[in-house]
Amino acid sequence: MDHLKRQDEKVFAAIEAELGRQRSKIELIASENFVSEAVMEAQGSVLTNKYAEGYPGKRYYGGCEHVDVVEDIARDRVKEIFGAEHVNVQPHSGAQANMAVYFTILEQGDTVLGMNLSHGGHLTHGSPVNFSGVQYNFVEYGVDADSHRINYDDVLAKAKEHKPKLIVAGASAYPRVIDFKRFREIADEVGAYLMVDMAHIAGLVAAGLHPNPVPHAHFVTTTTHKTLRGPRGGMILCEEQFAKQIDKSIFPGIQGGPLMHVIAAKAVAFGEALQDDFKTYAQNIINNANRLAEGLQKEGLTLVSGGTDNHLILIDVRNLEITGKVAEHVLDEVGITVNKNTIPFETASPFVTSGVRIGTAAVTSRGFSLEEMDEIASLIAYTLKNHENEAALEEARKRVEALTSKFPMYPNL
């Protein structure tokens, strides 16, 4: 980054500081990952200069012959990975992908059935502070009070009662496998569309390690980062019958020019996801998550649903007599990055919470394996149990430093 350093020392310094943070801390935020240098090179390419409103072969600007190739590569690779009939890779985010689906099939005030945010859903699945909850009449389903797993009988009962036009499946904090086939059966029984938001699990689906929602859903949305390990962005997969409507909802509906440099980075990441070593990577994510969950439970920590089937673990910290906010802060103080998170049947404020959400996608990209999961479980428990003991926290910091120093990050940057 020699040019940046010469041109803007302040921005350069901030980026260097962030690189230092990523190198020195243990990244456990479930929605984050570390992209390859090839993905970063594509995103930092000259494609950032090109306006390309429209779609390949039908642009509103000249000079799009090369970016057309890039977008076609991205779309074709997604079709190969997931078996989708139609793909739109232009959404700038998962939220915009969800918005485009809603705009395609819903009218203002239509009823939608989505997962309660504190039970593991997402802001765009009907939260009253989000456009989805403002524009549409969302009815919530959730998890069982004892098992903390989706109660499909309850979903069916609510669907029969409220007759939604759309059912939304998928989550941002649900550590168990979702039965997409069952969701489609429920949707068909009440005459609803089914949209699956697979943002968190897309990489696991790509590797064949989680059921694929594409054969069951009318629409599938996802981010391109998280377990898929691409740049930050979104995309939509849908049945061919909705292709023109979805494309129109993205452009000119809610976006103008696509970010072609980001689409190039998406294409590179999709190419990586087609390789055999990506399947190994995804399996290691799950293996690490299971080992970490086991370690946390051995340390006496309480896990929502009692464990995990994917990359994500939700810790209920109430038995430690602390809040999620305190847990996030003290873990960050010793070099472990997590996020506070609501838990099912939450009683605390979303700014405080009773839980912490963690995931293994980023640490697995870094090369951590089962042995490191044992140490991380020990570190988390030790830190939370001694959150007011400065000597203990200093010891935890040294253990984190010893661990991260074994796995250098981005040595060429």
Swiss-Prot record:
Disulfide bond positions: none
Name recorded for this polypeptide: Serine hydroxymethyltransferase
GO cellular component annotations of the record: cytosol
GO molecular function, one term: glycine hydroxymethyltransferase activity
Location of the protein in the cell: Cytoplasm
GO biological process, one term: glycine biosynthetic process from serine
Organism whose genome encodes this protein: Bacillus cereus (strain B4264)
N6-(pyridoxal phosphate)lysine PTM sites in chain numbering: 226
Gene name, Swiss-Prot/TrEMBL: glyA
Record has Ribonucleoprotein as a keyword: no
Quaternary data: Homodimer.
Catalysed reaction, written as an equation: (6R)-5,10-methylene-5,6,7,8-tetrahydrofolate + glycine + H2O = (6S)-5,6,7,8-tetrahydrofolate + L-serine
InterPro entries, per the entry: PyrdxlP-dep_Trfase (IPR015424), PyrdxlP-dep_Trfase_major (IPR015421), PyrdxlP-dep_Trfase_small (IPR015422), Ser_HO-MeTrfase (IPR001085), Ser_HO-MeTrfase-like (IPR049943), Ser_HO-MeTrfase_PLP_BS (IPR019798), SHMT-like_dom (IPR039429)
Enzyme category, top tier: transferase
Site (Plays an important role in substrate specificity): 225
Metabolic or biological pathway, per its Swiss-Prot or TrEMBL entry: One-carbon metabolism; tetrahydrofolate interconversion; Amino-acid biosynthesis; glycine biosynthesis; glycine from L-serine: step 1/1
Required cofactor names: pyridoxal 5'-phosphate
Family indicated by similarity: Belongs to the SHMT family.
